[in-house]
């Protein structure tokens, strides 16, 4: 009888499965960092050791240049090349975002701004928005949103339904600094929300909201 896979083997496979939804191969370090629903905390060396010796995982995963992905019709080599292209696109978008952050700082009601979604994962394409999460003072969400969005709308730097705008700024999420807890928005064992929160990339943070 074959031995049953361990908790760590299951967690590793779930992690690679999660990233496979975004066509993203992952390194040993990334698997360890983002390990999905393990029973206990594992050391990096434990993750690396079981990846090297587990026949159960080796039947399901493919390795290329230090990156793991599910075995299938698309090779890890192809996925890795696409990931590198997305990384370069995200790097360009982050440069534009950092320049825009100088304007964000002029608005006292805006307390913090972070990149989210595919930009936070360094996984954007040419058609992707610059998605942002904005934290404001209590009672100032709507006024802050107005003054924050207005110049980008006037400059044509917002997502447009009728034509494409390169690297448009999408102010996707707002909250106040008093309502940072998001438990009410979560499903039970909400893997997506856990990844979303953990992947935030602060652009600036006046009050340590993201610390």
Residue ranges of predicted features:
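Catalytic core of pol beta-like nucleotidyltransferases
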Residues: 2-112, 116-127, 136-211
